[in-house]
Amino acid sequence: MSIFLCFLLLLPLSLILFKKLLPSKGKLPPGPIGLPIIGNLHQLGKLLYKSFHKISQEYGPVVLLRLGVVPVIVVSSKEGAEEVLKTHDLETCTRPKTAATGLFTYNFKDIGFAPFGDDWREMRKITTLELFSVKKLKSFRYIREEESELLVKKISKSVDETQNSSVDLRKVLFSFTASIICRLAFGQNFHQCDFVDMEKVEELVLESEANLGTFAFADFFPGGWLIDRISGQHSRVNKAFYKLTNFYKHVIDDHLKTGQPQDHSDIVSVMLDMINKPTKADSFKVTYDHLKGVMSDIFLAGVNGGANTMIWTLTELSRHPRVMKKLQEEIRAMLGPNKERITEEDLEKVEYLKLVMVETFRLHPPAPLLLPRLTMSDIKIQGYNIPKNTMIQINTYAIGRDPKYWKQPGEFIPERFLDSPIDYKGQHFELLPFGAGRRICPGMATGITMVELGLLNLLYFFDWSLPNGMTIEDIDMEEDEGFAIAKKVPLVLIQTSHRW
């Protein structure tokens, strides 16, 4: 049976649901006219946030699209985002379900994609207490500092071995963030772990995230699962999922080995105790699926998100020599010459680095589209009626580049945040790299500290330049597809140890 024939068989049911989901009254947001059955799917490219941005430029900051039989509201303004994430936070703080997210979160047993409710509250409480609290952030400081030292030693070694050597920063920084995340969350030191190959871990994260971000026919059409199976989509996603699950199995088995040394008491150990030694006071039962769901959130978001942010920051600095020079001069002036080791206390001394980070988040947010929300009741956004069970997407990429909020929005100008109250912590809705409200990213502080410390080391100890014959205009800024904004073409720079 062909895919086309399957699609024809599903048409009658799709038409019925399409009409049922079509709101019959009230002022709805504007949007492009869709085709029968598929709606607006044909108007979307591989980079959804750019497709949404283009549509919003024509139809306005609040747009109604229909993806198959699924109504979707795209919000591309500060004002609309504030209404969704603050005014109507409680009515919109659950998540829609897709085939891929259900699979990679072990039936929504995680934090990021879990529906709003008691289970989500309990899981967030556990992870906040055991991983993301201020106390835990401070206790994991030694891990971040040790891995930063190793990063510097690794690059210094390559400089000593080959003059004017170049470095593929994607590989180096991916290894850096993966090592930190896995040590603080899983208690696994990749440098001493016999079942981990860093090359395979990188492949695992990228493949998992790519499949996690894919849409299936089942997400938009009743009975679409049949087309997913015939097309091979179901098989591809499951193959990636099984690889990820096998990695988690190794981590869990390693924890269950008697006498196996760990860096510290990590969240895997804590949740294993909850699973194997539940107390009578525990009304919420933690399962292995909860454990693996949380591992997915931390591993996929933490590793790739952190590496991407560091790469985009160094890319923008390479494209703007004035900013690079100013930042390195401030860092070296504030930290002093010939410093052997950088600590997290040094982060408080470099104000311009923080401005550079905020500007990077504006142009290259870790999630160009915040994780989708689902309305739990009828609400109004910017005067438009938004029915219950409607998916809402906040386009942070579009908001961060809107000339209504930013002068010269396409330019990388960290000074725009000098003496500005705007930050990235969810209180200023023109800048939302980590979201806002009840579903704000709980690992924000951990991720920021890791990224800033890594960059501080790279910019203090090394001078960076483009490979011979390459100019600023040659730097490729193309973005790759997926949940996160990744640089498609690796950033390769020449590093030299700084001489005082």
Swiss-Prot record:
It is found in: Membrane. It is a single-pass membrane protein. One of its GO terms (molecular function) is iron ion binding. The chain crosses the membrane at residues 3-23. SUPFAM superfamilies: Cytochrome P450 (SSF48264). It comes from the Eukaryota. The keyword Kinase does not apply. Keywords: Heme, Iron, Membrane, Metal-binding, Monooxygenase, Oxidoreductase, Transmembrane, Transmembrane helix. GO terms for cellular component: membrane. Heme binds at residue 441. Gene3D superfamilies: Cytochrome P450. Its EC number is 1.14.-.-. InterPro entries: Cyt_P450, Cyt_P450_CS, Cyt_P450_E_grp-I, Cyt_P450_sf, Cytochrome_P450_71. Its cofactor is heme. Belongs to the cytochrome P450 family. This is Cytochrome P450 71B38. It comes from Arabidopsis thaliana (Mouse-ear cress).
